[in-house]
Regions:
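Canonical Rossmann dinucleotide-binding motif of NAD(H)/NADP(H)-dependent dehydrogenases/reductases
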Residues: 57-99
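Residue(s) in the substrate-gating loop at a strand-loop-helix junction
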Residues: 206
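Conserved NAD(P)H cofactor-binding loop of Rossmann-fold oxidoreductase domains
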Residues: 155-160
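Active-site helix of classical SDR
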Residues: 187, 222-225
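Substrate-binding pocket helix/loop in short-chain dehydrogenase/reductase
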Residues: 163-164, 168-173
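Rossmann-fold cofactor-recognition segment
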Residues: 115-129
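C-terminal beta-strand-loop-alpha-helix "lid" module of Rossmann-like NAD(P)-dependent dehydrogenases
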Residues: 240-299
């Protein structure tokens, strides 16, 4: 009984939040209509009332949402931890049948999702054989359980911090293969099922697409490319009843493991760096490694705590008339991105650097770089 009350209260709160704008407008309009009536504008009041009713109806119509049922399947790519893991749990709580792909089939994320009733399959989006097996498994599951494919969520991503010249060819290639080509490949392989079920495609984008930042040039490029691809795909698939949406979930690096291997990435950069570059960057590289390694510790596997992420995500998943982009951003991000957009480059570049707050550059060759692994912080502490 308490669980039922909790669910009902939660739904009521969500309903009030979603329609709070129209409630406020209608209340203001009602007060205005009473004022007009008292002032003697009796013929104007019916016309204004009809306009208010029509506007309220259209607003509620636009804001209306579909319902989720157990025979609705949602595919989420990249669910080992972080956002993918959290969205898989949330979609399961909504009542959907969730199909989650993981890189590590025996990892803690896969095991916990399996305990929650999520269908977990192994998938490396850069491996064509894996893709084929995953698609066959999804097709079999949909047919066996008579499921309707409701949505594909492209979430798999790799982010490597480090200036562009430092990153190895393998690191750059990995980000391109997972973030951009991986999403394109899995979507293409699932497209026949997506068309048949008039499904929805949600692409996880990033604020780095809106404003690329130093240190993640390749990552920003993959997210910008992914968004451009999704925009064109949205226009192509609209006539088939397939909706394509970009979802920007916001920043939660400290709650995610997306940077857990950053120390090893820095070591690879140092090992492959030419001698000239080592002397040029010197202590700047070491300071950079220490700074960003401090925020790249592996975190405990937990569901993301920001409730706003799930509120915005539900709009992308359930709105009958969805927007092209859904963003979860704090007032700080909103102000920064507005300033980035309206200020000249000389000022916006300064704001971006202040926003990132990386270690300062003190000139070339300030100190010869320590070529040993001791130059990097010990991640075991």
């Amino acid at each position: 009984m308490e669980l039922v009350k909790s669910v009902m209260n939660s739904r009521l709160v969500k309903y009030m939040k979603r329609y709070c704008t129209i409630f406020t407008v209608d209340l203001s309009a009602a007060i205005g209509l009473v004022h007009l009536w008292n002032k003697g504008y009796k013929y104007l009041v019916p016309t204004a009332t009809l306009c208010c009713i029509g506007g309220s109806y259209l607003y509620c119509r636009i804001k209306s949402r579909d319902k989720i049922s157990p025979n609705h399947a949602i595919i989420i790519i990249g669910c080992d931890s972080g956002l993918g893991y959290s969205l898989a749990l949330h979609c399961r709580q909504l009542g959907a049948t969730v199909i989650a792909s993981v890189l590590q089939k025996d990892g803690p994320g896969a095991k916990k999702l399996g305990q929650k009733g999520v269908h977990v399959f192994s998938l490396d989006v850069t491996n064509f054989l894996d893709l084929s097996h995953f698609v066959d498994s999804v097709r079999s599951l949909l047919n066996e359980e008579n499921l309707e494919l409701r949505c594909l969520i492209n979430n798999a991503a790799v982010m490597i911090f480090g200036e562009f010249e430092w990153q190895t060819h393998e690191q750059i290639e990995r980000q391109l293969q997972v973030n951009l080509f991986g999403a394109i490949r899995i979507t293409r392989e699932l497209m026949p099922m997506i068309r048949i079920h008039s499904s929805r495609i949600i692409v996880i984008s990033s604020h780095c697409k809106i404003q690329p930042i130093p240190g993640v040039a390749t990552y920003s490029g993959t997210k910008a490319g992914l968004t451009a691809w999704a925009t064109a795909l949205r226009l192509e698939l609209k006539k088939y009843g397939v909706k394509v949406i970009c979802f920007i979930p916001g920043s939660f690096i400290k709650e995610s493991n997306i940077m857990a291997g950053q120390a090893e990435h820095f070591k690879m950069m140092m090992d492959s760096m030419p001698e000239e570059a080592k002397h040029f960057y010197a202590d700047y590289f070491n300071n950079y490694c220490k700074y960003f390694s401090s925020v790249s510790q592996a975190t405990k596997l937990e569901k993301l705590q920001d409730p706003r992420i799930y509120e915005v995500f539900e709009g992308a998943l359930l709105d009958k008339y969805p927007s092209a982009i859904y963003k979860n951003e704090s007032w700080r991000y909103f102000i920064y991105h507005t300033l980035f957009a309206i200020t000249p480059y000389c000022l916006s570049d300064m704001l971006v650097l202040k926003f990132v707050q990386g270690p300062p550059w003190k000139g070339p060759g300030a100190m010869v770089m320590n070529e040993s692994a001791e130059a990097l912080p010990d991640q075991s502490k």
